[in-house]
Amino acid sequence: MGNVIDAFLFQPPEPSRLKKSKIFWLDTSTGTRIPAFHIEYGCEGRKRYPPRVSNSTTPITLLYSHANAEDLGCIYPWCKYLSKHLGVNVLAYDYTGYGLAMEEGPATEEQCYADIDAAYAYLRRTLQIPASQIVLYGRSVGTGPSCYLACRTSESSKEDTIGGLILHAPFLSIYRIIFESGCTLVGDRFPNCDFIAAVEAPILLIHGKKDKVIPIAHSEALFQTIQRKYRAPPLFVDRMGHNNVQLSMRHLFLNHLNAYMERYIRSNCPNSYTKPVPRILQQPKKQQQGYVPDLCAQSSSFSVSSRSSQYSSAC
């Protein structure tokens, strides 16, 4: 049964291309080596964005855990875009069994935990980034290792708690997707619903209401499991599915993320950027009428519930 579940859960694509100069390697506790890249805000390639505030400040760092059928080459342009428009650094890594680490062994739940631990250790020990300035961002299957790490740092007496947790199209657990189980059974994978209850950091949930891969009911149930004081207003978007919230609704998506970062993360980090000004806010008129940037696959009309569209103090 375990191998069948893993085959369903992990479906790495053919390794995509990414310049070797952009990656470095991390050693995991299980003996595997995984590739990663680190995008520094304002220092990407030959392009330089003007700093938004004083150079004495330090950007927040997103630790990005990608979705199932992706690898580093697939997500590099998107992570660069996030860095630019959120004013953050981004560290992303591949799971063992993915991309250039495909020959390192198969992807498993336990190995994913070791992989994100290695990435986090690099941020904390090598780059010496304070935990409060690290925000975990997991999308789809990436919400599994992200919830694990957020829980581990919250429960550990030897580590500081991370600054925040962003879960994009999360699930309660793998068995709850496949079998619609109501509890964590033996052999289940990535029990996010169990981890998230222990997390002591502000949590933002993002989900399309028409998601047919992971129904929005998973996010709605997770939201109720989060400790009340750590519930950030979620972003639940009408007419959006599993893969297009961040693409078709880019303006809404970035505004909501920037509001979350400003209210819950930067306000608690005196040495971080105090108030980024995302360029997406000064969008062209065409985009306001439904125009979709080049990176998007398609456009769509939408509506957002009042609870998730406004950053009020209700949550």
Where are the predicted features?
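The serine-hydrolase catalytic nucleophile loop
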Residues: 67-82, 103-104
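Alpha/beta-hydrolase active-site loop
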Residues: 106-128, 148, 194
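Primarily recognizes the serine-hydrolase "nucleophile elbow" in alpha/beta-hydrolase
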Residues: 121-126, 131-179, 198
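Short beta-strand/loop motif that positions the catalytic acidic residue
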Residues: 198-200, 204-207, 211
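C-terminal catalytic histidine-bearing segment of alpha/beta-hydrolase fold enzymes
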Residues: 216, 220-224, 228-315
